[in-house]
């Protein structure tokens, strides 16, 4: 009986794990981001403020949701950081900067590899090709931090996302984070100010309340049915095994009674012979 109960519980858990869509993998590339990103602030402080870093930038990055630009931006960040690394490799005074950039290059390369391994339906092609631009260090690494945050929240399962369509009124002057240099006040890893600013607004735009409710309903129904199926399988197995267990117990009792009768008969014969 104990084995039967254990099997029923195991069956239910397997049903939940295999068929429950609420069990999702979020942040699939989160483990690729190491603590080395904390050195970004130190690197920005070491670089001259008037230094310009080349980057192929996706137009409208601050208007579009992250799934529209994340793949392209990560690839372009890898190219720009690699070029920056090559420039510091020949400068003996910049060994500290070289070490930091080298670690950042490895992180970005790992993220590119992670995105290739986990092809997400959320990731779409940018509506425009990247444009070559030059950024001050703090603006460049602001884009870096935002891309890191977007990748840390990347999911493998497609969700309701907005279309990657640029507003017709978008212009370089309105792309404020590109044209205006702001104090580098971002936390090295989370970039919380950005998350509270543009990232949050993008996510809200990409997942309206109505769509979110429908999405949760669509996930909850299969989860409920999978739970019912698990209980049904467990009940059927118990019902099938219960008669066998009853018959086995009865057979054991009959065998014991037969053995007792045989022993009594044997003793009776021995007594008669004496």
Curated annotation (Swiss-Prot):
The chain crosses the membrane at residues 216-238. Glycans are attached at residues 90, 97, 145, 196. It is a single-pass type I membrane protein. Residues 26-215 are extracellular. GO terms for biological process: cell adhesion; positive regulation of cell population proliferation. Keywords: Cell adhesion, Cell membrane, Cell projection, Cytoplasm, Cytoskeleton, Disulfide bond, Glycoprotein, Growth factor, Membrane, Secreted, Signal, Transmembrane, Transmembrane helix. Residues 1-25 form the signal peptide. Disulfide bonds join 29-114, 68-164. GO terms for molecular function: cytokine activity; growth factor activity; stem cell factor receptor binding. GO terms for cellular component: cytoplasm; cytoskeleton; extracellular region; filopodium; lamellipodium; plasma membrane. Residues 239-274 are cytoplasmic. InterPro entries: 4_helix_cytokine-like_core, SCF. Pfam families: SCF (PF02404). It is found in: Cytoplasm; Cytoplasm, Cytoskeleton; Cell membrane; Cell projection, Lamellipodium. A soluble form is produced by proteolytic processing of isoform 1 in the extracellular domain. It comes from the Eukaryota. Homodimer, non-covalently linked. Heterotetramer with KIT, binding two KIT molecules; thereby mediates KIT dimerization and subsequent activation by autophosphorylation. Ligand for the receptor-type protein-tyrosine kinase KIT. Plays an essential role in the regulation of cell survival and proliferation, hematopoiesis, stem cell maintenance, gametogenesis, mast cell development, migration and function, and in melanogenesis. KITLG/SCF binding can activate several signaling pathways. Promotes phosphorylation of PIK3R1, the regulatory subunit of phosphatidylinositol 3-kinase, and subsequent activation of the kinase AKT1. KITLG/SCF and KIT also transmit signals via GRB2 and activation of RAS, RAF1 and the MAP kinases MAPK1/ERK2 and/or MAPK3/ERK1. Belongs to the SCF family. This is Kit ligand. The gene is KITLG.
């Amino acid at each position: 009986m104990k084995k039967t109960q254990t099997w029923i519980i195991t069956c239910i858990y397997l049903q939940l794990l295999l068929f429950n869509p609420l069990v999702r993998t979020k942040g699939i590339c989160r483990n690729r981001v190491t603590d080395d990103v904390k050195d970004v602030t130190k690197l920005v402080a070491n670089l001259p403020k008037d230094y310009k870093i080349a980057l192929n930038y996706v137009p409208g990055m601050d208007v579009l949701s992250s799934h529209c630009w994340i793949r392209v931006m990560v690839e372009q960040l890898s190219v720009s950081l690699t070029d920056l690394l090559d420039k510091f490799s020949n400068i003996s005074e910049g060994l500290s900067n070289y070490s930091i950039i080298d670690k950042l290059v490895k992180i970005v390369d790992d993220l590119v590899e992670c995105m290739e391994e986990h092809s997400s339906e959320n990731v779409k092609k940018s509506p425009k090709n990247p444009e070559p631009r030059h950024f001050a260090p703090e603006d460049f690494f602001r884009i870096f931090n935002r891309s890191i945050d977007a990748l840390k929240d990347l999911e493998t399962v497609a969700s309701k996302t907005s279309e990657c369509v640029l507003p017709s009124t978008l212009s370089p002057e309105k792309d404020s984070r590109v044209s205006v240099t702001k104090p580098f006040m971002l936390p090295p890893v989370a970039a919380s100010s950005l998350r509270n600013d543009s990232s949050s607004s993008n996510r809200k735009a990409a997942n309206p309340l109505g769509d979110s409710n429908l999405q949760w309903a669509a996930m909850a129904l299969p989860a409920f049915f999978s739970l019912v199926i698990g209980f049904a399988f467990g009940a059927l197995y118990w019902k099938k095994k219960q008669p066998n267990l009853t018959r086995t117990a009865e057979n054991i009792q009959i065998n014991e009674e037969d053995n007792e009768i045989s022993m009594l008969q044997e003793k009776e014969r021995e007594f008669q012979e004496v």
